[in-house]
Curated annotation (Swiss-Prot):
Inhibits the classical pathway of complement activation and prevents accumulation of deposited C4. Gene3D superfamilies: 2.160.20.20, Autotransporter beta-domain. The lineage of its organism: Bacteria, Pseudomonadati, Pseudomonadota, Betaproteobacteria, Burkholderiales. This is BrkA autotransporter. It comes from the Bacteria. PANTHER family: AUTOTRANSPORTER, C-TERMINAL REGION OF AIDA-LIKE PROTEIN. Residues 742-1010 form the Autotransporter domain.
Amino acid sequence: MYLDRFRQCPSSLQIPRSAWRLHALAAALALAGMARLAPAAAQAPQPPVAGAPHAQDAGQEGEFDHRDNTLIAVFDDGVGINLDDDPDELGETAPPTLKDIHISVEHKNPMSKPAIGVRVSGAGRALTLAGSTIDATEGGIPAVVRRGGTLELDGVTVAGGEGMEPMTVSDAGSRLSVRGGVLGGEAPGVGLVRAAQGGQASIIDATLQSILGPALIADGGSISVAGGSIDMDMGPGFPPPPPPLPGAPLAAHPPLDRVAAVHAGQDGKVTLREVALRAHGPQATGVYAYMPGSEITLQGGTVSVQGDDGAGVVAGAGLLDALPPGGTVRLDGTTVSTDGANTDAVLVRGDAARAEVVNTVLRTAKSLAAGVSAQHGGRVTLRQTRIETAGAGAEGISVLGFEPQSGSGPASVDMQGGSITTTGNRAAGIALTHGSARLEGVAVRAEGSGSSAAQLANGTLVVSAGSLASAQSGAISVTDTPLKLMPGALASSTVSVRLTDGATAQGGNGVFLQQHSTIPVAVALESGALARGDIVADGNKPLDAGISLSVASGAAWHGATQVLQSATLGKGGTWVVNADSRVQDMSMRGGRVEFQAPAPEASYKTLTLQTLDGNGVFVLNTNVAAGQNDQLRVTGRADGQHRVLVRNAGGEADSRGARLGLVHTQGQGNATFRLANVGKAVDLGTWRYSLAEDPKTHVWSLQRAGQALSGAANAAVNAADLSSIALAESNALDKRLGELRLRADAGGPWARTFSERQQISNRHARAYDQTVSGLEIGLDRGWSASGGRWYAGGLLGYTYADRTYPGDGGGKVKGLHVGGYAAYVGDGGYYLDTVLRLGRYDQQYNIAGTDGGRVTADYRTSGAAWSLEGGRRFELPNDWFAEPQAEVMLWRTSGKRYRASNGLRVKVDANTATLGRLGLRFGRRIALAGGNIVQPYARLGWTQEFKSTGDVRTNGIGHAGAGRHGRVELGAGVDAALGKGHNLYASYEYAAGDRINIPWSFHAGYRYSF
């Protein structure tokens, strides 16, 4: 029984002496947890008990009635439960915890002070109210904590109505603690809980329900909320409160242009941890920090706002500018969602207003709503945050400020990581008007019709390591926005855009930047940035548009323009021109202008400049066969030293040779142009060309440089030469047949390997080198015949040649061959052998064109070789011997037609070659113990090529074969028969001639004889 406990304890509770009256608690009962109060309220009051403790307050007295649930009714000027350190009001010590108390307060007389349900005042004064109810539906103040007092509300329900003042905690050391329960009320502009002048409020897992006014106000105090929910319902058509009169004192409710569920005034601090906050109705706002020193921190949780012209999170003064600017909001891991036209997720306004947003999601659903809006000096930093907007005209980030003369500095946004996505029509990923925005590692994408990734009117946009992309419009749009600016604000408007550190920008309609106004625009691409799309302006008038572009440090722009006033290409900067373009002033500072290679059926392009200076590279495409090419035209003064890199489609000029005009000048200035191609020459089809100026017309044209072959044609001619490979294969087998003459045997299996370096010079092509290596295996059988011995066998071999075309590149030949042979060794020293070999060869070359590109080709041919060799071995004293020999060889390869990767057409005729060789071997046969034999020798010979009929044609131009040539050959080697059936050989050779030199040739082999 509460009253029994109450009588047993000293008390300072002040009870009005007027008779108890029952209150209709319909509004309170409608709130959660209030229905249980109805039975107690329905009971009639009992007669007073004689001798009950009481105290006097405001001249009114009251008495308790003996009940389980005590009901306290408080009227104007009254206090329901008072724990006060004022000597005039001090009574006996109150119980530390009161339970199941039902307090009703009213404020009827505007000339009187409002009634107070609970008041705790004074250091050391503490009271806990549990499981109780405070009804303020008729006005009044539910609770007051001041002067260092402490009040704890545990599971308490507070119901407020019109005229209710907020529960207030004020003064340093004062604490109001709310755990669980429901706090609700209808109090326009007043609030449910107010912390002032250093007071502290802590709310845990409670439900706050505010109608037509804020739930929390921190005005010089601090409020901490953990868990639970906050709801504010503004109702339909709710107007904002009027501004305060000049000189009027600051009231409990703020004179603002918006009402928020949570307010932080001057030096007020509010922290919300994992709180679900909802605000409903026109002009509703979630949280609002609006004065110097005010701070609101959201950690986790959600903010949901429904209604037009509101906001989710706001920092800074309102549009009325009635208060000094200031306010800071911090969000970490929070989700902010708005569903209303012109209702921003985060709004920061004023020079001293700040927002810090980390790991947060910001969403807006209706038209003209921004994910982040920084206005009039406000500053916002975002880290790893996702912004999503869906309405027409919505903006992911809006930066709006006035000119300095308007009294406000520029606003700014700094965002690192995360993304910005807009899906509405006529929307913008970022909108910039007199301010600055820096995006680092942020992906910005605009999906809707007429929507741009960036819409700019004035200010600076820096995009680093991120992207700007528009699905249906230009990536960047520059436009006037007079509705967002004060009069005269456009007078000094400029737009600066800088993409750096690998940032990308691309418009879905093929436009990178669209200029809708005469605002000067400066675009800079740096440090690997890439922009794709054209730069265009309404009317395509470059002088009116005032657009300048600079590209440097590995950055590139792929697009065309007719409106650039100036373009500067710094070191490492590239402009890829994909259509006819015009620039008023071009300054080359080590950069590169590259004409995009035309697609099939596409026309070549012309870049027209009014002036040109500096130094740089121009990359132009040509098709000499069609007489078409890209052109650079300078209509005014041209200065500087420039280089021209020419890329050809692979066609061939007519018989008169190519004279394609690449660069056209007016003869004004000192500009010079030279080829940037390798060797200062251009490969065009079969021939090489140089660049020269016509002194009369001042046109720089390509002219054929004599009979020099292009790199591709040179490789095609040299690749067709297989006779040198056939000679290397034949030489390997010669060693095997020579070994048969060492001693008679029944034949057997054998294996040989060889490698030799060849330096070859063709008559109509440049010299090249190749290393030919191979492996052969075979099996033969020997039998005795009249006057000698016969051998017959077969072979299988693989050959690999690695070719080097000096200054151009290289190639490879891979061949497989099979063959058969027969040999006769007479008893009188005569011998005769013949070989037939059939092969298949895969020929490849890969060379560097003079334009820096690669030219490749790969084709296959077949070949056949037949040789006949004869000689006689003369035995000399002391086991010396001399062996003269002669050989004839026929070689034929099939023809082939193919096209190289650059379009060069190649026709290789079938080739027939005839060779003859005369030679002499001189050596000594050395018999060793056990029947072993070692035979060292030296060799001298001459090889002559008598005929070569195969020609090579490139683009229809013929190149004759190598013709007659010869070479001298020197060599040394050793043959050995060791043990039973084991035979080894090794040799070295050198050859020199007018067409082929062999600096070294090594052979080694083994056979086993039966």
